[in-house]
Amino acid sequence: MRSKLREVDETDITRAIFSRAAREWADFTESDVIVVGAGPAGLAAAMYLARYGFKTVIFERRLSFGGGIGGGGMMFHKLVIQSPADEILREVKCKVEPLTEGVFTADTAEMIAKLAAGAIDAGTKIVPGIVVDDVMFRDTPLRVTGAVVQWTSVTMAGLHVDPLGVKAQAVVDCTGHDAEVLAIVSRKIPELNIVVPGEKSMWSPEAEKLMLKNTGEVCPGLYVAGMAAAALYQTPRMGPVFGGMLLSGKKIADVVTEKCRALVPRRKQSRRSNVA
């Protein structure tokens, strides 16, 4: 390996970033599936959707991904996974340590890194620093047809800047406790009769069962997984046990596949080409 770095002019750096980023934005402006939120459910959902051949993009409001994984339990760097969700982590070569029969612990940093790598390697495009500000919809028949996106920094600054639209056959709300996409739709498209009452207090075993049960289609074109499902159906929170989150992501990928099979051509299962 060369020890001397090749020089790159400042304008070449700028031009490379603009041109390559613009090329990718132009590509995923029409996607098959938009996953909102790069937490455990969102990363798992995107990984399987991309594996199934769908053109999948994740929009994440932060400049990092992992959602609630990074905080572990009260910032201790471990969390709990129960079977059969450990199989998802094993697929991405994330180590799990047995605790009791069917119960495991995992390292937060490794879980974030391996899940994200799994989604990216499957073909998902993760775009950080983007907030979903609204949705696109049509009324004949009534359905959600995409997401309206904005830079997170613009919304934080309170600037009046018009957002842009990204089309998809399915938008999946994986934004966690706040159920951000569902909250927007409940406010702006009242004819869908969506109400987001928020989650109940902690009851881990029941929370895991109900969240997984309620993962699914909310209305045509709009889906929910992870803690957003708890917020929508007012079921308990579960704390730092993540098996249900991972299985919820896998389930919503299967639900979207079943619903969109006739709408979206099945793509060849291969990795998206790396940008040179």
What are these model-predicted stretches?
Residues 1-33, 118, 151, 198-204, ...:
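Extreme N-terminal leader/targeting segments of oxidoreductases
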